[in-house]
Amino acid sequence: MKNLYTKEKLTEEINQVRKQIGHEELEIHIEDIYYNEKENELWIITQDRPDKSAIIGKGGWVVGKLREKLKINSIHVESYGDYLTKEYKLKLSKKTLDEFNSDLTGIQNLKKILSSKLENIYSFDYNSYFESNIFKESEKTEAVVALSGGVDSSFSLILAKYLGFNPTAVTIDPGTIILPNQYKRNIKKLTDQLNAGHEYIKADYSEIIRESLNGRFHPCGRCSKHTEELINQYAINNNIPIVIFGDMLSTGTQCITPQEKGLYRLNLPASLAVGKQ
């Protein structure tokens, strides 16, 4: 990886773009620049969030025009403070997993990817990582992945598969009002592509739906709780030690937590400090 521009030259280019689209010129502070020649991607690390906002511009116009001008496939703009936060979360996750006494294949591989991400905090790329790091899959199923068909749970299943957990995906099916047919099509396509086992569990959420429509409570908490209970019970019944959820909030010390009967919950995206990006 090499730098395409100096900080000064890049700041000049940014302000030229800002001027062209009617934005005022600003003093922009860039902490660091990383260019991935293979992917033709540029990372701009700013000193603070206002600098990040200045580079992105209203509606993303500045960074979009900058990408076109520099003929770059993709430009990522992050503030240095955000990376410090991410680094801190990753270190906490690594500490938590290092203290988790387990010889599970998937857990050991998760520790490896955590270390690699800490070493390449600015420019870590999952596609490139898994192209050059192919992990042996566990002979036994080590994890159940709660798969809703949405982005977070789908990403969790992909990660679990590539990390060697030999996962089985389980989808709670309360009917089309909660699980539309489009999500079922997404689920089938993904599990087929990954060659991952998958099961549906029929569930009755009618009371939760009825009471929420009557305004008695917000459905998310109760729906989520009931889903977790069903997923956990499936794992216990099948002697599978880990349940994986696509939670992105339970980072660091909460990335893996004990449940009932020796079961553990792993919030896989959160353990890797993955955000909505």
Where are these regions (language model features)?
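N-terminal presequence-like segments and adjacent domain-start helices
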Residues: 1-13
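A short amphipathic beta-strand at an alpha->beta junction
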Residues: 67-89
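ATP-dependent adenylation/pyrophosphate-handling site
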Residues: 134-188
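A conserved beta-strand->alpha-helix junction
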Residues: 57, 184-216, 247
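A short, basic/flexible loop-to-alpha-helix module at the beginning of a structural domain
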Residues: 110-141
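Active-site adenylate/phosphate-handling loop in enzymes that bind or generate adenylated species
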Residues: 208, 214-277
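A short interface-forming secondary-structure element
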Residues: 39-61
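Short edge beta-strands and adjacent turn/loop segments
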Residues: 19-45
